[in-house]
């Protein structure tokens, strides 16, 4: 793909769903309000996805349209969406039984409990043949920008870090799994990248 062709990207945003008293609740009635709305690993979490888009304007428009539909429906149902990375409260968060959850429980074990308390935004960028290393290194360089959007320092009601989500993912949930959770170092050559993927 020549560099002049558009780079397709999509976004997934996750929100905690709360009732009018601020208690976490299931997103009943919200999933069907728009295309791209889905349940996640845990009961009170809602994910809204876009399709791959070629322009920022197209991506923004689709995300705003889908999010707007969910927000209007949430308002009708007395629900709210909370964009915090981790909930402030200390209560347990119930799993949403699924094959994905069972796999994570089997692979990650007890440490998957940390993931249950995390919501976030995920950006998917189309891989360009021949440009994989430049793309990876660019994304690694952009990662520190996460520090600018930390939204909750809490895990189970306790202040644990300025950005609890990063700490939970990188240093607790996936700490025992090489190549998962932590930020990968820059890559200098294709062979190094291939070796990492084979591990």
Feature roles, as predicted:
Residues 1-112, 117:
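Terminal catalytic/cofactor-binding subdomain
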Residues 117, 126-199:
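Loop-rich catalytic cores of soluble enzymes, especially ATP-dependent carboxylate-amine ligases
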Residues 123:
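An acidic/histidine-cluster motif and surrounding catalytic segment
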